[in-house]
């Protein structure tokens, strides 16, 4: 364990690196679960939870008080474009400088490289902390929610384009899916970088259902689009909806969305969520037409 220089106040939080041992990972995830129960939003995204403790995974920082109980944590991923971090503070220890101590440690970890920090739920305390440390609001990820029935009605009658057939995912489709996902999300900083290993990690999750990953193929067998649904803990989500750029603006996206909503309705789901970038105008237009409404927002703050 390596420690950052302690703050001058004797009772201020101390922040230190910790090895990603199973006990440390379990402790951080338990802390995250407590924060989620209190805030109504998870402090870590799915990729973070999947890579915690993995070889080559993110750096872990823990904040401790005078009695060594963990007060908060930061998960820091290093990449070619700098570092990206997510922070969590135990609800029982907020307003005591823990968040500031963690963020200062993250900024020190960056050593002058660009820094991005996610604030899930756009908590007022996160906004104040970003202002105090000179981080700029750089990106917004919207969480939208809709009644399955209202969303389906909003789309109206939707048929697959001529020559396009739907099927469910099989292991033989994996490489085609990774290739199309990269094309469909070429400009997306996370989704477009998904590898075969990332896909395999998600396929191995308990929530994965191959029948909920709908594939649209042209008559020649080429994968043209997909709609991946996720149902976890009873909550349905439009996990990823992607269309080959060559097939954009031809109705395939709305037809895939409708097909997924029909599947959710058949399975008895009343409500569905999704996440979309705030500046993705075409996708937002589709989802607004389908009666999706704002539910929450995640904000990425950045220092260049």
Curated annotation (Swiss-Prot):
N-acetyltransferase domain ranges (all copies): 16-155, 164-304
Superkingdom classification of source: Bacteria
Keyword Mitochondrion: no
UniProt-listed InterPro entries: Acyl_CoA_acyltransferase, GNAT_dom, MshD_Acetyltransferase, Mycothiol_AcTrfase
Pfam families attached to this UniProt entry: Acetyltransf_1
Residue ranges that the Swiss-Prot or TrEMBL entry lists as coiled coil: none
Gene3D superfamilies given in the database record: 3.40.630.30
Amino acids binding 1D-myo-inositol 2-(L-cysteinylamino)-2-deoxy-alpha-D-glucopyranoside: 46, 190, 230, 237, 275
Any one biological process term the GO annotation gives: mycothiol biosynthetic process
Amino acids binding acetyl-CoA 2: 241-243, 248-254
Swiss-Prot/TrEMBL catalytic activity: 1D-myo-inositol 2-(L-cysteinylamino)-2-deoxy-alpha-D-glucopyranoside + acetyl-CoA = mycothiol + CoA + H(+)
Record SUPFAM superfamilies: Acyl-CoA N-acyltransferases (Nat)
Keyword set, alphabetical order: Acyltransferase, Repeat, Transferase
Assembly notes: Monomer.
Family: Belongs to the acetyltransferase family. MshD subfamily.
The protein, known as: Mycothiol acetyltransferase
